[in-house]
């Protein structure tokens, strides 16, 4: 049985992009015979300035939304990264086979470091080594497949390189994973800046649809979405990013392809209206389940506790084997 691992970082409220590009896909894979682990990667949220209380609150909210989206703890493992010490243990070993040059070539590091410096802040070492911890997250479980968006593909490629390098130097220890991506909506873009990702870490704004937005707020954001200078509804990511983003969102909500849907609309207004309603209907059952789960906090805590216990049982033997392989004495 193949093993799947993926995670979500609690740096902001989960967005439509997180759902279409990640969480909904998790619900699909965990029902089809895969051994799937889904994680709130809270350690990754500490790489920038943060409010501790907010990280805890967003971690709990992310876990609740994952369950509300349809993840079944009877069929998959849902847990919090910091509850499983093996992630941090293995991360140091991965640092011992990674190079400084590899870390500095990571696109996300360069972009985030540049933004931090523009704000006059200092860049934390943990931001540079973020991909190493991500590699440890993946490799600790013998992961075969990692469902990711386009922006994380480079990190999975690094994970593959580190696994191969470790295996060559110290003996076969790790499964070499591969990234999997959805055909549609792998990267939902900001409705006001359609060349930028709809990121949960961004400031609150009209271009971001959050999973817990009220229906009227969703409609308002979609109807005010930036389109393009042309008048025809044409799917072309390069020259028509605004309308293409709406078509991809609609296709992800209702099925079909963006190209086929483009031929069904004669105006931007009609496309926006249908897209807005499709998003509202997509989020409605998730929001209802989220409300019900919030009324049972003990249930969510129990799921996370049981998930962490199983995750430790899976990760510990492989991490212990890596410690032996690299030359460390057994305790």
Swiss-Prot record:
**Known catalytic reactions:** tRNA(Trp) + L-tryptophan + ATP = L-tryptophyl-tRNA(Trp) + AMP + diphosphate + H(+)
Keywords in UniProt for this one? Aminoacyl-tRNA synthetase, ATP-binding, Cytoplasm, Ligase, Nucleotide-binding, Protein biosynthesis
Q: Name one GO biological process term.
A: tryptophanyl-tRNA aminoacylation
Enumerate the residues binding L-tryptophan.
Answer: 137
Please list every transmembrane segment annotated in the UniProt record, as residue ranges. none
GO molecular function terms listed in the Swiss-Prot or TrEMBL record: ATP binding; tryptophan-tRNA ligase activity
What organism is this sequence from? Streptomyces avermitilis (strain ATCC 31267 / DSM 46492 / JCM 5070 / NBRC 14893 / NCIMB 12804 / NRRL 8165 / MA-4680)
Q: Name one Pfam family in it.
A: tRNA-synt_1b
Task: Give a GO cellular-component term.
Answer: cytosol
Q: Which Gene3D superfamilies match?
A: HUPs, Tyrosyl-Transfer RNA Synthetase
| Span(s) of short sequence motif 'HIGH' region | 10-18
Q: Which PANTHER family match?
A: TRYPTOPHAN--TRNA LIGASE, MITOCHONDRIAL (PTHR43766:SF1)
The entry's family comment says: Belongs to the class-I aminoacyl-tRNA synthetase family.
Q: Could you tell me which InterPro entries the record lists for this protein? A: aa-tRNA-synth_I_CS, aa-tRNA-synth_Ic, Rossmann-like_a/b/a_fold, Trp-tRNA-ligase, Trp-tRNA-ligase_bac-type, Trp-tRNA_synthetase
Give the matching SUPFAM superfamilies: Nucleotidylyl transferase
**Main location per the UniProt record:** cytoplasm
Q: What does this protein do?
A: Catalyzes the attachment of tryptophan to tRNA(Trp).
The name of this protein is Tryptophan--tRNA ligase 1
- Keyword Glycosyltransferase attributed: no
User: Known EC number(s)?
Assistant: 6.1.1.2
Localization per Swiss-Prot or TrEMBL? Cytoplasm
Q: Which residues bind ATP?
A: 9-11, 17-18, 149-151, 188, 197-201
Subunit annotation: Homodimer.
Span(s) of short sequence motif 'KMSKS' region: 197-201
């Amino acid at each position: 049985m193949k093993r799947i691992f993926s995670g979500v970082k609690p740096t902001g409220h989960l967005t439509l992009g997180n759902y279409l590009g990640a969480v909904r896909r998790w619900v699909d894979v965990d029902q089809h015979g895969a051994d799937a682990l889904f994680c709130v990667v809270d350690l990754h949220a500490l790489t920038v300035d943060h409010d501790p209380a907010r990280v805890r609150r967003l971690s709990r909210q992310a876990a609740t939304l994952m369950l509300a989206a349809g993840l079944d703890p009877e069929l998959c493992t849902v847990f919090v990264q910091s509850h499983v010490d093996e992630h941090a243990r293995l991360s140091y070993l991965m640092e011992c086979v990674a190079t400084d040059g590899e870390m500095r070539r990571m696109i996300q590091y360069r972009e985030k470091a540049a933004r931090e410096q523009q704000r006059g802040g200092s860049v934390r070492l943990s931001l540079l080594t973020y991909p190493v911890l991500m590699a440890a997250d993946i490799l600790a479980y013998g992961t075969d497949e990692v469902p990711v968006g386009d922006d994380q593909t480079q990190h999975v490629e690094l994970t593959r390189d580190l696994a191969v390098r470790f295996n060559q130097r110290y003996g076969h220890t790790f499964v070499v994973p591969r990234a999997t991506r959805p055909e549609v909506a792998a990267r939902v873009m900001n409705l006001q800046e359609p060349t930028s990702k709809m990121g949960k870490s961004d400031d609150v704004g009209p271009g971001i649809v959050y999973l817990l937005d009220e229906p009227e707020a969703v409609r308002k954001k979609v109807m005010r979405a930036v389109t393009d200078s042309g008048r025809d509804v044409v799917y072309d990511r390069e020259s028509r990013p605004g309308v293409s983003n709406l078509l991809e969102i609609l296709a992800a909500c209702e099925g079909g392809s963006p190209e086929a849907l483009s031929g069904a609309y004669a105006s931007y207004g009609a496309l926006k209206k249908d897209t807005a309603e499709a998003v509202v209907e997509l989020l409605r059952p998730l929001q209802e389940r989220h409300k019900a789960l919030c009324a049972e906090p003990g249930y969510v805590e129990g799921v996370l506790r049981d998930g962490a216990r199983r995750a430790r049982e899976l990760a510990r033997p492989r991490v212990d084997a890596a410690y032996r392989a690299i030359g460390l004495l057994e305790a």
